[in-house]
From Swiss-Prot:
This is Lectin-like protein EP153R. GO terms for biological process: symbiont-mediated perturbation of host apoptosis. It comes from African swine fever virus (isolate Pig/Kenya/KEN-50/1950). Its main location: host cell. Glycans are attached at residues 81, 94, 100, 106, 112, 119, 139. Down-regulates MHC-I expression by impairing the appropriate configuration or presentation into the plasma membrane of the latter. Participates in viral hemadsorption, which may help viral spread. Reduces the transactivating activity of host TP53, thus inhibiting apoptosis. Non-essential for virus growth in swine macrophage cell cultures. SUPFAM superfamilies: C-type lectin-like. Keywords: Disulfide bond, Early protein, Glycoprotein, Host endoplasmic reticulum, Host membrane, Host-virus interaction, Lectin, Membrane, Modulation of host cell apoptosis by virus, Signal-anchor, Transmembrane, Transmembrane helix. Belongs to the asfivirus lectin-like protein family. Residues 48-158 are extracellular. Signal peptide: none annotated. GO terms for molecular function: carbohydrate binding.
Length: 158
């Protein structure tokens, strides 16, 4: 029963292990050489073969700001009156209250964006009016002198 089975001798087994080891060394050497070659090509001028993305279209917003349509917006989560909100925006990343003069995004879209990120609350935004004029919002008239006392959320943009 055991006589027909062939067991490799110790010398044959070492020979197989040695061949396996040499083969592993050969593969590792090949991989190291190809990595060094690729690195050398990238460092010394062969970088034209790699397609690089243009950085012109990339913009970064400060932490806790939302990037949208090439502009950054900060949606407050605390209430301030208009004057304090405007000052906060000026002191925060050199920004302003979001306003109706923005060329990148109209105010309606901005307020719809605020619903997406936060809630249906009201926000201070800067809307240019001639002096001593009032604006009608939701069937209510607010004059500029009242804004110092009304506290609500606000949106900064830069």
């Amino acid at each position: 029963m055991f006589l027909n089975k062939k067991y490799p001798s110790l010398i044959e087994k070492k020979m197989d292990d040695l061949m396996t080891l040499k083969f592993c060394y050969l593969i590792i050497t090949f991989l190291i050489i190809t990595n060094i070659f690729s690195l050398a090509i990238n460092i010394w001028g062969g970088g034209d073969m790699i397609d690089r993305q243009s950085c012109e279209n990339i913009f970064y917003c400060p932490k806790d700001w939302v990037g949208y349509n090439n502009a950054c917006y900060y949606f407050s989560n605390n209430n301030k009156n208009y004057t304090d909100a405007n000052n906060y925006c000026k002191n925060s990343h050199n920004s302003t209250l979001a306003n109706n003069d923005t060329k990148l995004l109209n105010l309606t879209k901005l307020l719809n964006l605020s619903k997406l990120y936060y809630n249906d609350s009201t926000y201070w935004v800067k809307y240019s009016l001639p002096k001593n004029k009032a604006v009608t919002l939701r069937n209510s008239t607010y004059k500029y002198d009242r804004v110092k006392y009304t506290e609500t959320f606000f949106i900064c943009s830069n």
